[in-house]
């Protein structure tokens, strides 16, 4: 049997499909999610049901979002899952997650995310942070490293700052390529993202926070003074507790937010 065919389904390159088939890893992921009846569970990209099936054994109803028509059809006819699932066939990147929220029952989102869309999909999900209890995702290990990174490390970047702005980030489990069919060329890892009830350092204008992050990380080897000279003077940086001669890659989330909030308060400067 060809190694890109699993349970009779051929993995599609354009959907970035790699199917999980290691029972030990699957068990670890389901334990991390810890699904309970009555929770508002949503799986993104259930694929061939490696995580869907064991979650289905724990709960009576949950929702899945699947882009691949054949896989959605397969789930509709699944002997154990068909009655438990609400299937949304379509693109999670364009999906309005507010339609799934129930009173006093926030979303618990999980999935083995296609690596080609994981970053933009997370940015899309952050928009719904108030409606989400937690998220558990299998991602490229390098992406998990970026989510969990601290200032000054190579992995630290815009994704780090925006993820940690909205969520507590907890790496859960490392996953070797051999856990998949076909095996990807990279290591994977599972991460837990828990949106804050109250944002620890709220930005007055998210577009400005995004802008200071982009400008900083696009020129991460410059000094902060040079990087932001068109936006913030050295005096203002000093006032905000930012050393103008440090590099943007060493700025903390709090410092990025302080800079963005100063720009929000001083639009004409």
Swiss-Prot record:
Primary subcellular site in the record, as a coarse category: cytoplasm
A single GO molecular function term of this UniProt record: RNA binding
Gene3D superfamilies given in the database record: Ribosomal RNA adenine dimethylase-like, domain 2, Vaccinia Virus protein VP39
Top-rank taxon, per record: Bacteria
InterPro entries: KsgA/Erm (IPR001737), rRNA_Ade_diMease-like_C (IPR023165), rRNA_Ade_Mease_Trfase_CS (IPR020596), rRNA_Ade_methylase_Trfase_N (IPR020598), rRNA_adenine_dimethylase (IPR011530), SAM-dependent_MTases_sf (IPR029063)
Binding-site list for S-adenosyl-L-methionine: 18, 20, 45, 66, 91, 112
Keywords: Cytoplasm, Methyltransferase, RNA-binding, rRNA processing, S-adenosyl-L-methionine, Transferase
NCBIfam families to which the protein is assigned, alphabetical: ksgA
Similarity remark: Belongs to the class I-like SAM-binding methyltransferase superfamily. rRNA adenine N(6)-methyltransferase family. RsmA subfamily.
Functional note: Specifically dimethylates two adjacent adenosines (A1518 and A1519) in the loop of a conserved hairpin near the 3'-end of 16S rRNA in the 30S particle. May play a critical role in biogenesis of 30S subunits.
Protein name as it appears in the record: Ribosomal RNA small subunit methyltransferase A
Species of the source: Vibrio parahaemolyticus serotype O3:K6 (strain RIMD 2210633)
Gene designation: rsmA
């Amino acid at each position: 049997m060809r190694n890109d065919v699993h349970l009779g389904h051929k993995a599609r390159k354009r959907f970035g499909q790699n199917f999980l088939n290691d029972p030990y890893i699957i068990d670890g992921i389901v334990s991390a999610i810890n699904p309970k009846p009555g929770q508002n569970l949503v799986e993104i990209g259930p694929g061939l049901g490696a995580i869907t099936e064991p979650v289905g054994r724990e709960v009576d109803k949950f929702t899945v979002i699947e882009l691949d028509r054949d896989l959605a059809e397969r789930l509709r006819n699944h002997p154990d899952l068909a009655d438990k699932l609400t299937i949304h066939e379509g693109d999670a990147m364009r999906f309005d997650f507010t339609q799934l929220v129930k009173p006093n029952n926030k979303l618990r989102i999980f999935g083995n995310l296609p690596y080609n869309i994981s970053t933009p999909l997370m940015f899309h999900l952050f928009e719904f942070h108030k409606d989400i209890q937690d998220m558990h995702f299998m991602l490229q290990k390098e992406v998990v490293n970026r989510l969990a990174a601290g200032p000054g490390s190579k992995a630290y970047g815009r994704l780090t700052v925006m993820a940690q702005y909205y969520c507590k980030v907890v790496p859960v489990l490392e996953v070797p390529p051999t856990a998949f069919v076909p095996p990807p060329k990279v290591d994977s890892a599972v991460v837990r993202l828990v949106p804050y009830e109250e944002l620890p350092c709220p930005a007055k204008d998210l577009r400005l926070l995004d802008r200071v992050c982009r400008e900083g990380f696009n020129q991460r080897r410059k000094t902060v003074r040079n990087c932001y000279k068109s936006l913030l003077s050295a005096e203002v940086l000093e006032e905000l507790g930012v050393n103008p001669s440090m590099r943007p890659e060493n700025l903390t989330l709090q410092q990025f937010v302080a800079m963005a909030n100063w720009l929000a308060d001083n639009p004409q400067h």
